[in-house]
Amino acid sequence: MAASGSRHPPISDDATSFAAQRERMVAQQISARGVRDPLVLAAMRQVPREAFLPERMRDLAYDDSPLPIGHGQTISQPYIVAAMIEALQLNGGERVLEIGAGSGYAAAVLAQIAGEVTTIERIGALADKAAAALAALGIGNVQVRQGDGSRGWPPGAPYDAIVVAAGGPHLPQSLKTQLAIGGRLVMPVGADQSAQRLVRLTRTSVDDVRCEQLADVRFVPLIGDEGWASVAPEPRADRPATVRK
């Protein structure tokens, strides 16, 4: 007979099911679409996406789509989370800044690779929920801050990598200056709020940067002093929306 307290708590059927779904997600949605970094794939296998969703939505946790989390914000599609983190080219142990904590899911994935993660969220209620979800999972190397993410978080600078989970009209100067030499900034950028290009900026010296365009994406807008002033209204139902080609 096993000694009292020597066994782990039983694994629930739900936990087993979610773990299997998570493995399929990595194989079918992420690896199959070109994400190859073993650190990123391992991190995506490790973090339970369902823990960052309301109870009523947890059955959708491993769908290949973004999901609403309230306040006009979303938890990003799993593939996009993986692709953006891969674009940061992390080796492990870095200091990372995330703009747009949202649910906290991407910060949890980053925390499996980076040494220290600071994530900024403009909306206080979401910042509180993200912090609670991270704490419930015992993730201790993430600091959640509320503030204007377009201005970064100077107290923690310089950062080895910065990832922005919202689309802005340009790359904020504050984020560029908070990058370490050799650091990478990955962010969606577009001239309007309906669609963006995913851009990677590498700071090659104090005064020089290199920019690459990676993919077409669509994110919620980055609201702030160095982003958009406000969310643009949706197109009226009685007028056709503009189609971008």
UniProtKB/Swiss-Prot annotation:
Q: Which UniProt keywords apply?
A: Cytoplasm, Methyltransferase, S-adenosyl-L-methionine, Transferase
Q: Does the keyword Methyltransferase apply?
A: yes
Which residues are the active-site ones?
S76
| Primary localization | cytoplasm
GO CC annotation: what is one?
Answer: cytoplasm
Family matches, as NCBIfam families: pimt, PRK00312.1
| Function in brief | Catalyzes the methyl esterification of L-isoaspartyl residues in peptides and proteins that result from spontaneous decomposition of normal L-aspartyl and L-asparaginyl residues. It plays a role in the repair and/or degradation of damaged proteins.
Which HAMAP family does the entry mention? PIMT (MF_00090)
UniProt name for this protein: Protein-L-isoaspartate O-methyltransferase 1
The organism is: Rhodopseudomonas palustris (strain HaA2)
